[in-house]
From Swiss-Prot:
Protein name per the record: Chloride channel protein CLC-e
InterPro entries according to UniProt: CBS_dom, CBS_dom_sf, Cl-channel_core, ClC, ClC-type_chloride_channel
Organism, scientific name: Arabidopsis thaliana (Mouse-ear cress)
Biased segments, Basic and acidic residues type: 502-511
Cross-referenced Gene3D superfamilies: CBS-domain, Clc chloride channel
Signal peptide start and end residues: none
PROSITE patterns found in the cross-reference section: CBS (PS51371)
Entry similarity comment: Belongs to the chloride channel (TC 2.A.49) family.
Alphabetical keyword list: CBS domain, Chloride, Chloride channel, Ion channel, Ion transport, Membrane, Repeat, Transmembrane, Transmembrane helix, Transport, Voltage-gated channel
Length: 710
């Protein structure tokens, strides 16, 4: 892109409006024929003649505008490997801390999951079962309050205190997740693992002061490392980063990440998986039971299981949404403090665990119990499995809504495993043992096979990661026979959940537009920058943030003026008529025009406000707009058109914003070369709307990536 700016500068006329947008890099090479005439000083393109700037000017533009250089591939790859190592070590420490806290909370109960609570007398354990999750919720509530306090900025984004707070926030969140899971609350560790990887990626990128593209690629690598180290499944981690991070961003911005992002993701995932295997052992997250697939005729049964898991996934999503709305309503309408809800969440889990102890988080050992992999542990009946599906959905949704910290992967696998096992037992009973069905020739697989497929189908439906779900189960089972049933069930589940999600999103969008139509019309006539941004949020909901996040948006030091400035702008000369100046502003949809001389030397800025003030002050004369010139307006305004403050493309956007705020400027010209040079050429315009949109888009993207809880 850096090389396209001098081309645009060379093709523009100094007395006409800019008509050339930067040529963005695409997969298909852009070719056109250009005829240069050194004698006549012009460029011929498609039969049109454009004045050509001097060669010295072009070289200066190339030197000054070529600031957006991508970092070396070697440094990016090394950074991705470093992210993988640090993420693997951090996830190992995180899991060890969860296990230590769990053993401390339950006095070192053997690794049998929560099945021991069904065998132990309830009278001797009921108080502990209730108090342990409740105390965990209380500690998480305190940590959440500390994290909110650490989230308040001092106003200087580069102060040492703010940097300490930036490190403290993810640390406190990780500790809160450790307490949540160690005390048995119904969430999972994979979401915090992704958060750990994303936080480490941000830290590494900040340490080396790299570009935003590198930072985004490292975030994808960190997310892959988090999943890889959590499940000891590197392939699934890579596809998770592709499905959850890279594909959503590629639909909106093709230049967000680096060309070698795929290599960075793979190396980071493999490195983290190796470190995790060294620290936690080579065994997978949960033990795969013995299973078999007996007949291709079972495929319709797996499709039906996928539809069932899709409905279960929708139930979990809707239940979480409803409980989150209820918590917000209780907080706003009833005045219940947010700090109370994590305690209520832990208390609710403890009460449910008195009857259904399997809802407690106990690693993946409860999943082993569902799949009947644990020796000397009696399997659960089909009706009890269905009850566990219902109570696990309620417990997980309430924990998530109450403010407890954790992810959705482990609960989704538990719910899917329970649903699949129950389905398999019902199918086996109906088709193999019931004499009412004359289908004895149909061989039905064991319930464990349906349990494994149900886990993947529910995971795909809840988290919208179908490829990750398929590859995760395939990587854990290492059996190609499971792929065909997996693909069918996962595809059916994803289709059901994605269709419902789109319809729900469409309904919410229509309701929002109907409710705010009057506000939108009013805001269209307003010149306030915040109104313009809100209009954009109404159209593009992916850029929306709540008010608390908007207040904390900060511009990182690595963002340059070139990434926010407008490269299309209107230019006028002192001899340009007022009518022509207004026409050029209208063509470019801007409220200002840059004043240049015949040599394209920047002189000042003409704004609509200047024209309006001139019109109000001019009381005599009947001159028409075409008889009034820019020189008349600038002379009458006492030299107001001459703006002494300019910025360069390679200047920090934060510094440019400081200049505009200090001198109360709504627009500032972006010029090539040094701002102190006597002859400077304009290359862009920076206004407050550009800064606001850039700040909000960056903050939204970072918020969505760094709050990625599955």
């Amino acid at each position: 892109m850096a090389a396209t700016l001098p081309l645009c500068a060379a093709l523009r006329s100094p007395v006409s409006s800019r008509r050339f947008a930067p040529i963005h890099k695409t997969d298909v090479p852009f070719q056109f024929n250009v005829v240069l005439s050194p004698f006549f000083g012009s460029v011929a393109i498609g039969g049109r003649i454009f004045p050509r700037l001097p060669a010295a000017k072009q070289e200066t533009d190339q030197d000054e505008v070529g600031f957006d250089q991508q970092p070396s591939q070697e440094l990016a790859i090394a950074s991705a490997c470093l992210v993988g190592v640090l993420t693997g070590v951090s996830v190992v420490l995180f899991n060890n801390c969860v296990h230590l806290l769990r053993d401390f909370s339950w006095d070192g109960i053997p690794d049998r999951g929560a099945s021991w609570l069904r065998e132990a007398p309830i009278g001797s354990n009921w108080l502990r079962v209730i108090l342990v999750p409740t105390i965990g919720g209380l500690v998480v509530s305190i940590l959440n309050q500390l994290r909110e306090s650490a989230g308040k900025s001092t106003g200087d984004s580069h102060s040492s205190l703010d940097r300490v707070k930036a490190v403290l926030r993810p640390f406190l969140k990780t500790v809160a997740a450790c307490v949540t899971l160690g005390t048995g609350n119904s969430l999972g560790p994979e979401g915090p693992s992704v958060e750990i990887g994303a936080s480490i990626a941000k830290g590494v990128n900040s340490l080396f002061n790299k570009s935003p593209q590198t930072g985004f690629s490292l975030l994808a690598a960190g997310s892959a490392a988090g999943i890889s180290s959590g499940f000891n499944a590197a392939v699934a981690g890579c596809f998770f980063a592709v499905e959850s991070v890279l594909w959503p961003s590629s639909s909106t911005d093709s230049s967000t990440s680096l060309p070698n992002t795929t290599s960075m993701v793979i190396l980071s995932a493999v490195t983290a998986s190796v470190v995790s295997e060294i620290g936690l052992g080579s065994e997978p997250a949960f033990k795969v039971p013995d299973y078999d697939f007996r007949s291709p005729g079972e495929l319709p049964l797996y499709l039906l299981l996928g539809a069932l898991c899709g409905l279960v996934s929708l139930a979990l999503s809707r239940c979480t949404s409803s409980m989150t709305s209820a918590v917000d309503s209780l907080n706003k309408d009833a005045g219940i403090p947010k700090a109370v809800f994590p305690v209520m969440g832990g208390l609710s889990v403890g009460i449910i665990a008195l009857v259904y102890p399997e809802v407690l988080y106990w690693g993946f050992q409860n999943v082993d119990i569902l799949l009947e992999k644990r020796p000397f542990v009696k399997g659960l009946s089909a009706d009890l499995l269905l009850q566990l599906v219902a109570v696990k959905i309620a417990a997980t949704a309430w924990c998530r809504a109450s403010g407890l910290v954790g992810g959705y992967y482990a609960p989704s696998l538990f719910i899917g495993g329970a649903a699949g096992m129950a389905y398999g037992k019902f199918i086996g009973l109906a088709l193999a043992q019931n004499p009412d069905f004359n289908l004895s020739i149909l061989e039905v697989a064991s319930p464990q096979a349906y349990g494994l497929v149900g886990m993947a189908a529910t995971l795909a439906g809840v988290c919208q990661v179908p490829l990750t779900a398929v590859l995760l189960l395939f990587e854990l089972t290492q059996d190609y026979r499971i792929v065909l049933p997996l693909l069918g069930a996962v595809g059916m589940s994803s289709w059901i959940t994605s269709g419902q999600s789109k319809r729900q999103e469409t309904r919410e969008t229509k309701e929002t537009r109907k409710r705010k139509s009057q506000e939108a019309v009013q805001s269209l006539t307003s010149s306030d920058d915040e109104s313009s941004t809100n209009n954009l949020c109404e159209v593009e909901s992916s850029l929306c943030l709540d008010d608390s996040l908007n207040q904390s948006e900060e511009l990182p030091k690595s963002i340059f003026v070139s990434e926010a400035m407008r490269t299309r702008f209107a230019t006028v000369m002192m001899s340009t008529s007022l009518e022509e100046a207004l026409t050029r502003m209208l063509i470019e949809k801007q409220s200002c025009a840059l004043i240049v001389d015949p040599d394209n030397i920047f002189l000042g800025i003409l704004t609509l406000s200047d024209i309006q003030e001139f019109s109000k002050a001019r009381k005599e004369g009947n001159n028409r707009p075409k008889d009034i010139f820019v020189n008349d307006i600038c002379s009458r305004s006492g030299g107001k058109c001459k703006v002494p403050w300019t910025v360069t493309p390679d200047m920090d956007l934060l510094a440019a914003q400081t200049i505009m705020n200090k001198h109360e400027l709504s627009h500032v010209a972006v010029v090539s070369g040094s701002i102190d040079a006597p002859r400077i050429h304009p290359v862009g315009v920076l206004d407050r709307e550009c800064i606001t949109l850039t700040r909000r888009a960056l903050a939204t993207r970072m918020y969505l990536l760094n709050s990625l809880y599955l």
